[in-house]
């Protein structure tokens, strides 16, 4: 291998490493996170994930905001397991049912 071929091989190696470094820099600067933020900033989205909590490897609690209302959703095994309904809970869940007064016996 003479001197010219060695210089050519080193130049090709430097060029390849430079391209890899350029790709890493571009992914950091313009990667999926920044693209997602740019799209979200351009659009007023109706559905937003506020917070997510992994309960175990298969189940996850997610707080989502839909049209300004927050809902709690339980996800697991690739399907919806439970969700909080719209509106306040029924009155029976808040207070015990009224007990009928006993009638006097004559």
Curated annotation (Swiss-Prot):
InterPro entries, per the entry: Flagellar_biosynth_FliO, FliO/MopB
Region (Disordered): 84-106
Membrane topology per record: Single-pass membrane protein
Key words, A-Z: Bacterial flagellum, Cell membrane, Chemotaxis, Flagellar rotation, Membrane, Transmembrane, Transmembrane helix
Signal peptide (from-to): none
Disulfide partners: none
Keyword Transcription regulation tagged: no
Alphabetized Pfam families for the sequence: FliO
Family statement: Belongs to the FliO/MopB family.
PANTHER family according to UniProt: FLAGELLAR PROTEIN FLIO
Protein name, as recorded: Uncharacterized protein CC_0952
Organism: Caulobacter vibrioides (strain ATCC 19089 / CIP 103742 / CB 15) (Caulobacter crescentus)
